[in-house]
């Protein structure tokens, strides 16, 4: 029979031992719900390999922009060939009012809205459920905290889901190639979204999927 929920799907993929050690606690922290109440397709997106390849993606070449994505976008906006042709407005709420939306819509033939679909329709069918994330950032007086950019904490007892050590996204060196004497870490806490919070990702269960389909 087909797995009916995430727990059954995970056990069928990796067995009970790995499920209990690596998946159950982390998943329930991330989603705030028991694994047997989450749909099976959530776990299907994760690659399962019986090799030493620890990459998430299968692409031959993988990387991040040098200096980060903020610098990449800034360079694109400052390109001499595009200078003056790209207007950037910050702190603008597209949905603040009908007049604001109409004014912004008039700026282009096509508008791409990347916000929440229920907010776009003014919650006429009700609120979708989301998860939010809180970051606790700390500067440590050590050149190395965990030796890796991201370490997941898969147990249920640790309140954070993972710790990011930012320097390792840039190989831990300064502009001269020297080791950095300090390091910055961020603990990541997953939490239930409420109005006023930033929604990071939707809750992909049957109830929310049905409401999302109505909004579409």
Task: Describe every region a protein language model picked out.
Residues 1-109:
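Active-site/ligand-binding neighborhood in enzyme catalytic cores
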Residues 92-215:
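Mid-domain catalytic core of redox enzymes
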């Amino acid at each position: 029979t087909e797995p009916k929920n995430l727990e059954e799907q995970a056990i069928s993929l990796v067995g009970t031992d790995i499920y209990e050690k690596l998946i159950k606690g982390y998943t329930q922290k991330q989603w705030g719900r028991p694994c047997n109440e989450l749909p099976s397709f959530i776990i299907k997106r994760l690659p399962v390999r019986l090799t030493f390849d620890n990459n998430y993606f299968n692409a031959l070449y993988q990387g991040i922009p040098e200096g980060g994505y903020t610098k990449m976008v800034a360079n694109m906006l400052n390109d001499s060939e595009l200078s003056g042709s790209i207007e950037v407005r910050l702190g603008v709420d597209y949905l603040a009012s009908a007049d604001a939306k109409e004014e912004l819509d008039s700026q282009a033939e096509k508008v791409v809205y990347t916000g929440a679909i229920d907010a776009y329709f003014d919650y006429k069918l009700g609120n979708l459920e989301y998860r939010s994330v809180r970051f606790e950032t700390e500067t440590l007086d050590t050149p190395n905290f965990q030796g890796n950019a991201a370490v997941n904490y898969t147990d249920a007892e640790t309140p954070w889901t993972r710790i990011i050590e930012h320097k390792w996204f840039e190989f831990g060196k300064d502009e001269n190639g020297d080791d950095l004497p300090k390091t910055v870490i961020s603990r990541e806490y997953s939490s239930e979204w409420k109005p006023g919070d930033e929604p990071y990702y939707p809750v992909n269960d049957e109830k929310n999927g049905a409401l999302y389909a109505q909004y579409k």
